[in-house]
């Protein structure tokens, strides 16, 4: 089943920031998103489930400092953030 990709406004702003600032990181984000679309909560970037306020969301490592935060639902994958660490 194919899921559609949905971007929260903050995540969209993060993505646009990376387009202007660092193409290498942008390429990594794109790789992680493609892997989420293919493999769900398994694969590259050390996927881990988040807890507390972010229960239901997962994160993957973009760099040592930055994480891709997302949630997989029946019909969509929601990207919540792709800059900084979760909760920042």
Question: Model-derived features: where do they sit?
Answer:
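Enriched for short, Lys/Arg-rich terminal
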Residues: 2-4, 10-27, 31, 44, ...
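A short, surface-exposed loop/turn module that caps and links secondary-structure elements
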Residues: 34-61
């Amino acid at each position: 089943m194919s899921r559609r990709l949905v971007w929260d406004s903050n995540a969209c702003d993060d993505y646009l920031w990376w387009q202007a600032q660092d193409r290498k990181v942008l390429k990594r984000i794109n790789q992680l998103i493609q892997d989420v679309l293919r493999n769900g909560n398994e694969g590259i970037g050390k996927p881990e489930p988040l807890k507390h306020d972010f229960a239901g969301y997962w994160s993957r490592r973009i760099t040592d400092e930055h994480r891709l935060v997302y949630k997989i639902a029946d019909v969509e994958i929601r990207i919540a953030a792709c800059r900084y660490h979760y909760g920042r």
